[in-house]
Structure formats: structure tokens, C-alpha cells
């Protein structure tokens, strides 16, 4: 079975062959690539949740009069999703600073667009530490 024709069936067949030790005919290069893709997917999900978290914390900080239950839920949900990802993938803890640094500009741009506030309102560099981002008690 070719992975391009029916990925699901290819994956199930490959997994079964691996379990039984039948390596003949397995596309080991493709299997390795798929495993790497799964790892990248987890890292991408973490980056996405961090961007959402930073965006809403910026709005929370710089538009206090507009704070809402919706914003609070977005912040709480992002933190919960991040905590779950880090619990399931502890090695991603070592990538947090890199991801925050890389994704903050997108969060900042989103805050500028969503709030309509001048760009100078929002710091160029992330104003939140990793500890603050992950702390369920931190709000401003």
C-alpha cells in the first residue's frame, strides 16, 4: 500500500509490520519522516497556543476597560492547552523561549489589528516572562 494512495491504511499496515518485526518492504525513510512530522506538529500546536495566549494577554493589559469573560476564557484555555502539551511532551519545555521569541511578533500584530491601538502601544519584545505566561494566577 502506497502512503499517497491511502495514508491511513499505509500507516496501519506499517504499524502492524513494525509490531511483528516484519521490516521487509517497509518504507523506513517515509516512516522516519512521518514520525518527525508528528513531532513538528506538536511544536506547531504549542506555538499556536502561545501566540493566542500572548495576543489575549496584550489585549488584557492594554485595554483594561474592555476585559471580558471571553478574553479570560481564551487566556485560561490557551494556558490549559499549553500545560497539556508540555505534560505530554516535556522536551518542548526547552523550546519555550525560542517559540515565544519567534511568535510574539505575530501576537503583537494581532493585538494591533484587533484593538486598533497604535503599534507603539505594544512593546517590540515580549513583555511577559515564560513563568508569567504559564502562571494561571498571572493576569497583567
Predicted feature residues:
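Surface/interface-facing alpha-helical segments and adjacent flexible terminal/loop regions used
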Residues: 1-140
Amino acid at each position: 500500500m502506497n502512503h499517497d494512495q491511502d495514508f491511513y491504511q499505509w500507516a496501519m499496515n506499517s504499524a502492524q509490520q513494525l509490531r511483528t518485526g516484519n521490516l521487509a518492504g517497509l518504507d523506513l525513510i517515509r516512516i522516519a519522516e512521518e514520525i518527525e512530522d508528528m513531532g513538528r506538529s506538536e511544536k506547531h500546536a504549542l506555538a499556536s497556543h502561545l501566540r493566542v495566549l500572548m495576543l489575549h494577554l496584550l489585549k488584557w493589559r492594554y485595554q483594561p476597560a474592555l476585559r471580558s469573560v471571553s478574553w479570560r476564557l481564551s487566556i485560561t484555555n490557551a494556558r490549559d492547552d499549553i500545560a497539556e502539551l508540555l505534560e505530554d511532551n516535556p522536551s518542548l519545555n526547552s523550546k519555550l523561549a525560542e517559540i515565544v521569541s519567534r511568535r510574539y511578533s505575530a501576537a503583537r500584530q494581532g493585538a494591533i489589528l484587533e484593538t486598533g491601538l497604535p503599534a507603539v502601544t505594544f512593546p517590540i519584545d515580549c513583555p511577559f516572562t515564560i513563568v508569567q505566561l504559564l502562571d494561571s494566577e498571572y493576569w497583567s
